[in-house]
Amino acid sequence: MGQIEWAMWANEQALASGLILITGGIVATAGQFTQWYLGAYSIAAGVLVCLLEYPRGKRSKGSTMERCGQKYLTRVVKLFGPLTRNYYIRAFLHLGLAVPAGFLLATILGTACLAIASGIYLLAAIRGEQWSPIEPKPKERPQIGGTIKQPPSNPPPRPPAEARKKLSEEAAGVPTGGPQENPMPVNDEVV
């Protein structure tokens, strides 16, 4: 059996928890909770988590499906180098971002999800995984002479392949199923 790539699961979990943090923060801020400033913090933390987690990392084996518009955020995440590539740093960053939001009921679900994502990232880091960007593969252009072996000799419309085989057999002198010459003379007398 193949080995589980934990970073892929942590990425999905962290992205979902960032969206949940944003939603809980909007509820807390718009609802004018007593600690509404923690709701505003949750919105900012959720946006930061979503921006960091939106670009998927390249899988070590197999192909990775890129998210829509990921290539633009991938450049930004690549700029931070080891700060974003190392999963130990991501695990502790997510855990640190989750703690203040845990003191408000509207954002506690996002906090729990982000803490779970942090644990999965820690597991991925222990197993030696690290983030690497999905690089677009250069498109190979087919060689012009390599795909066409022999250009057609007669212009279109061409007869079907079976008819072309019969024509080539007739040219070679091979008898076909058509009319044959009778070696005995036949006299036709009509009465």
From Swiss-Prot:
It is found in: Cell membrane. Residues 134-191 are annotated as: Disordered. The modification Phosphoserine is found at residue 168. Keywords: Cell membrane, Electron transport, Heme, Iron, Isopeptide bond, Membrane, Metal-binding, NADP, Oxidoreductase, Phosphoprotein, Transmembrane, Transmembrane helix, Transport, Ubl conjugation. One of its GO terms (molecular function) is metal ion binding. Phosphorylation at Thr-147 enhances NADPH oxidase activity by promoting NCF1/p47-phox binding. Ubiquitinated at Lys-149 likely by RNF145. It is a multi-pass membrane protein. The modification Phosphothreonine is found at residue 147. InterPro entries: Cyt_b558_asu (IPR007732). One of its GO terms (cellular component) is plasma membrane. Residues 31-35, 105 are extracellular. Its main location: membrane. There is a cross-link at residue 149 (Glycyl lysine isopeptide (Lys-Gly) (interchain with G-Cter in ubiquitin)). One of its GO terms (biological process) is innate immune response. The chain crosses the membrane at residues 8-30, 36-53, 87-104, 106-126. Residues 2-7, 54-69, 81-86, 127-191 are cytoplasmic. Residues 70-80 dip into the membrane without crossing it. Belongs to the p22phox family. Component of the phagocyte NADPH oxidase core complex/cytochrome b558 complex, composed of CYBB (heavy chain (beta)) and CYBA (light chain (alpha)). Component of the phagocyte NADPH oxidase complex composed of an obligatory core heterodimer formed by the membrane proteins CYBA and CYBB and the cytosolic regulatory subunits NCF1/p47-phox, NCF2/p67-phox, NCF4/p40-phox and the small GTPase RAC1 or RAC2. Interacts with NCF1 (via SH3 domain). Interacts with SH3PXD2A. Interacts with DUOX1, DUOX2 and TPO. Interacts with NOX4; this interaction mediates superoxide generation. Subunit of NADPH oxidase complexes that is required for the NADPH oxidase activity that generates, in various cell types, superoxide from molecular oxygen utilizing NADPH as an electron donor. Subunit of the phagocyte NADPH oxidase complex that mediates the transfer of electrons from cytosolic NADPH to O2 to produce the superoxide anion (O2(-)). In the activated complex, electrons are first transferred from NADPH to flavin adenine dinucleotide (FAD) and subsequently transferred via two heme molecules to molecular oxygen, producing superoxide through an outer-sphere reaction. This is Cytochrome b-245 light chain.
